[in-house]
């Protein structure tokens, strides 16, 4: 156990050294500003495919007990076209001012718009938090929260030109941490019964921009290795410490929010972890902890189920917009 702790500290020290100017004097001022926006050990929960009732409530209680400071919900809310009940469930457990960011799923489309629709409830929450966003929220939108750049699109559900929007938004933002969120998948980016719904272009634009890809739709959990190409399923590294760059990233689906659990139908060497009914899965959430111990470009992720079991754990280091010190480090190798 002590050895594992030392190894993790060593990884974070290496990540930190990549950021030190002069190693130190040439870090960009804008990058330093971005660093300061993410509090140390800032925890985000990633969920999807939720529903109403006991299972969904258990996952939200897990989010609360783990000390998550924000939720990213990748679509499919209550499955009953009842925005008021869905919002009330969140408020009852997490509170009406909890940072809860959600993108539209296929089961949310019918009641998405309007003054009593899902989108309006989500906008009201953002307004209470004084969080500004660009675009059509939850459909084709972006926002900055605690130094993390979040893009939410809806390929296969609502709107169009989502890949173009991802490319444009990623090109003009200089955050270390960027997350591209949507609900549906390509068939080979899930392991159950879902079809090719999104097109590869959204995956590839997110990869080129060095963004983590967060999806759901498959009612199970899985994550890829570090990828050079999603379209051709090309693995760049199988290390459990994932080093993100512009052109290399990973994707996951986290759809165990409470509705149901699917069995596994597909597999492939690009998967680092698969957790479905076939593996005896329980409902749960993926948690990402950013700025680990004050190292701005270090994060650690773990998937925990409502039984208290951690079924996946991995570290992530971002080399996206971490400043010229990274280039100095590379040139010295």
Task: Please provide the spans of the model-predicted regions.
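Short acidic, glycine-rich surface-loop motifs adjacent to enzyme active sites
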Residues: 173-191
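Active-site glycine-centered loops adjacent to acidic/histidine catalytic or metal-binding residues
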Residues: 49, 75-76, 105-106, 183, ...
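Outer-membrane beta-barrel translocator/channel fold
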Residues: 189-199
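Bacterial N-terminal signal peptides that target proteins for export
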Residues: 3-14
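A short C-terminal boundary segment appended to hydrolase-like catalytic domains
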Residues: 261-333
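Extended active-site neighborhood of metal-dependent phosphoesterases/phosphodiesterases
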Residues: 64, 83-178, 197-202, 212, ...
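N-terminal active-site segment of His-dependent metallophosphoesterases
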Residues: 27-88, 156
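Bacterial N-terminal signal peptides
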Residues: 14-22
